[in-house]
Structures are given as structure tokens and as C-alpha cells.
Amino acid sequence: MSGSKSPKGEFAGRKIVLKRKESRWHHYKYVNKALKLKEKSDPLGGAPMGRGIVVEKVGLEAKQPNSAIRKCVKVQLIKNGRVVTAFAPGNHAINFIDEHDEVVIEGIGGPSGQAKGDIPGVRFRVVMVGKNSMRELVRGRQEKVRR
């Protein structure tokens, strides 16, 4: 006689709850959430944005079938010293960013916090340069302060 593995009966509640708790650990999303692996591996440490200093400007080739050089910057984060690559969005946006500038970066919005579109391995984008919004600089509504 084949029966189900789940206990049945009037007093089976505790056993069912314990079994469910145990089974959760076989699901990778639950494990990542329970052990806070996202915060541990994320360069921003779970924060929505982070400040950093521009180390160098780089041009990355787009993935096939596109053909372009995507303008990016390498940024050293202030909070933990990690170096990440961030995309500079907008026409001629790279011209507003100089080495040793302080920038604010955020996630680029790819699937599961990963790279987006045809830019390989880039998970962040530049939001602000100094105190100026990147979007406003590109549109010409703000000028970058020269020291």
C-alpha cells in the first residue's frame, strides 16, 4: 500500500511545520535570503547607492550582435575600497566625468541584480558627479563645478 510521505491526522501539525522548515533549505532563493548572501557579496553591501572615487575611464565593447564601445568608469567605493565598473549613461556623459571625481553609483537594473543589455559584466551606473545629477549634466541644465 503506497501512502503519501506527509503525516496525516489530528495531531500532525507540528510534524508538518517541521518538515516544511526543513524543505525550505533546498530552495536556493530561501537559502540566499536566510543567510543574507546578497548583502555579503554585493559591493554596495545591500545599500541602494554608493559613493566612490573614479580610478579610470574605460571603453567596453558591446556584446554580439551589437557593435559599439560603451563608455564606463572604474570606481573605488569609499565604504569598503572595492573597485567596480559603472556605466556612464547618456550622450557624451563620459566627458563630464574626470579621474579622481567623486561619483554616486546605483544598480543598473538588470535581471537579479546582474548586468543589463549588451554591456558585459557592468552592474552599476553613474547617477551623480560631485553634487550634480548625471541626467541634468547630459541635458545641459546644470554645469559641472570647476575647482
Swiss-Prot record:
Part of the 30S ribosomal subunit. Belongs to the universal ribosomal protein uS12 family. With S4 and S5 plays an important role in translational accuracy. Located at the interface of the 30S and 50S subunits. The gene is rps12. GO terms for molecular function: rRNA binding; structural constituent of ribosome. GO terms for biological process: translation. This is Small ribosomal subunit protein uS12. Pfam families: Ribosom_S12_S23.
